[in-house]
UniProtKB/Swiss-Prot annotation:
Belongs to the KAE1 / TsaD family. One of its GO terms (cellular component) is cytoplasm. This is tRNA N6-adenosine threonylcarbamoyltransferase. It is an enzyme of class 2 (transferase). One of its GO terms (biological process) is tRNA threonylcarbamoyladenosine modification. Binds 1 Fe(2+) ion per subunit. PROSITE patterns: GLYCOPROTEASE. Required for the formation of a threonylcarbamoyl group on adenosine at position 37 (t(6)A37) in tRNAs that read codons beginning with adenine. Is involved in the transfer of the threonylcarbamoyl moiety of threonylcarbamoyl-AMP (TC-AMP) to the N6 group of A37, together with TsaE and TsaB. TsaD likely plays a direct catalytic role in this reaction. It comes from Campylobacter jejuni subsp. jejuni serotype O:6 (strain 81116 / NCTC 11828).
Amino acid sequence: MKNLILAIESSCDDSSIAIIDKNTLECKFHKKISQELDHSIYGGVVPELAARLHSEALPKILKQCKEHFKNLCAIAVTNEPGLSVSLLSGISMAKTLASALNLPLIPINHLKGHIYSLFLEEKISLDMGILLVSGGHTMVLYLKDDANLELLASTNDDSFGESFDKVAKMMNLGYPGGVIIENLAKNAKLKNISFNIPLKHSKELAYSFSGLKNAVRLEILKHENLSDEIKAEIAYAFENTACDHIMDKLEKIFNLYKFKNFGVVGGASANLHLRSRLQNLCQKYNANLKLAPLKFCSDNALMIARAAVDAYKKKEFVSIEEDILSPKNKNFSRI
């Protein structure tokens, strides 16, 4: 019975393929190969290197799931937003598969995929607020009961996750910075460094992490010897202030929208300090908090496959001749 959808994710530095049953939502296959170690020596993702590693990793993963090919009914792939050369790796493979197996091709927006990480094994819920925090994006969304997405707030410059990477780089801590900063912050003892919360007195529903990042840079310059103890104090102060900033604007949004349900997605949503703060906020406003599983917060093909199930039902297919690659976020107005 042809009821399986194969999905490919390659928007940045994770090569991933997943296969899902469109009827039961059962995951039949999921594999991800991360490039973090390859990029860590450069302090960030190098697009050309990412593309080459995708071209090596994706075929290796594909060989492991060939037994399911006979039951495939569609091929899905992340087509936006992301690094052009990385996206192209996945799209090229998806088009080749769709052509060879004579199957429909489904393009999936990467950010929609993150939203679907909340609903990997269940029907999607509408009428809820969503915080999306990742290395490339920081936004608060309202998923309306008609499936339309309304953008309530976004960042004016750096994203939440990106700011962690940059602060880690300032202190020569390595890449990716999120987990490194989070773990280092736990070692802070004095907690005598503090930073101002960005846009604290602004009524604008927006985020900005560039000023906080600069404040960290200036704090680092104060210390001739940046000891492990001082690094921990800076990491703690930065993480706490970055989360304060997220919560400050969210509180204003909660007062306006009275959410009954609120979801949190994206790679940076794995930060446990942020999760704890969000739980407290939702308890305060009697909202049900829904968190993506830690395993599926970062980029993965299973969330793309899950999004593709609903897209398949709506017959959102494209021709393999169509140019579907877009580094920017184009198709993100509704689920």
